[in-house]
């Protein structure tokens, strides 16, 4: 379901994957990482696991995330990890998923893989479960208003590491899925309440929680 512009969530899953290829409809995950955050961005739980995939990992993908087939020999299978990940999401009673460009890549890729593997879940179906895209629903608007000089510094560039570095957030180890979601978490909770204060308003607190 599309994000309706109100941040009325209490258990947010910040999610990222590393994959075998750059196209969502031909990729499979080689790493899934996620943290569950409360409304203020405090981490409540985490999940991080590499996956022994049956897909060939493209050289271009390995050049980005540094994961090769030899690194996954002793990892669990994709169906095992994805099944446990979906159970973990359910047990954490999440009410939305936050990604960075993940509405166009991570969620449809995971939705396709779950269907292929016979895993019943709605978490990755954009028509059934709410997702927030950290770029299109946050950073793009921040650049429009030139928050902290983002537009001047980055122009049309959008990579998570560039945004993090400009905002003074550590990007060491980028392209490991867990490192990337921690960057995204820090960026989102720094930027979104400032540029979208009405999203964060509550009945008892008419202004931002921050």
Report residues per predicted region.
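Metal-dependent phosphoesterase core characteristic of DEDDh/y 3'-5' exonuclease domains
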Residues: 3, 10-11, 25-67, 91-210
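Long, highly charged low-complexity segments
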Residues: 5-6, 17
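Short, hydrophobic/glycine-enriched beta-strand segments
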Residues: 12-16
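Short acidic, Gly/Ser-rich segments with clustered Asp/Glu that frequently serve as metal-coordination loops
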Residues: 17-25
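Metal-dependent phosphoesterase signature
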Residues: 64-84
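Short, well-structured alpha-helical segments in soluble
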Residues: 83-91
């Amino acid at each position: 379901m599309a994000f309706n512009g109100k941040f009325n969530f209490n258990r947010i899953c910040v999610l990222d994957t590393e994959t075998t290829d750059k196209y969502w409809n031909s990729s499979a995950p080689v790493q899934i990482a996620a943290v569950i955050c409360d409304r203020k961005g405090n981490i409540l739980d985490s999940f991080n696991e590499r996956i022994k995939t049956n897909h060939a990992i493209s050289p271009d993908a390995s050049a980005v995330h540094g994961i090769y087939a030899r690194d996954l020999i002793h990892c669990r299978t994709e169906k095992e990890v994805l099944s446990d990940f979906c159970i973990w999401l359910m047990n954490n009673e999440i009410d939305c998923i936050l990604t960075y460009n993940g509405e166009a890549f991570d969620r449809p890729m995971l939705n396709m893989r779950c269907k292929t593997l016979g895993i019943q879940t709605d978490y990755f179906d954009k028509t059934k479960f709410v997702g927030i895209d950290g770029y299109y629903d946050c950073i793009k608007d921040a650049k429009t208003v030139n928050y902290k000089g983002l537009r001047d510094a980055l122009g049309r560039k959008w990579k998570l590491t560039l945004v993090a570095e400009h905002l003074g957030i550590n990007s060491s180890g980028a392209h490991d899925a867990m490192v990337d979601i921690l960057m995204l978490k820090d960026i989102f909770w720094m930027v979104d309440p400032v540029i979208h204060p009405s999203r964060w308003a509550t009945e008892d607190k008419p202004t931002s929680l921050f």
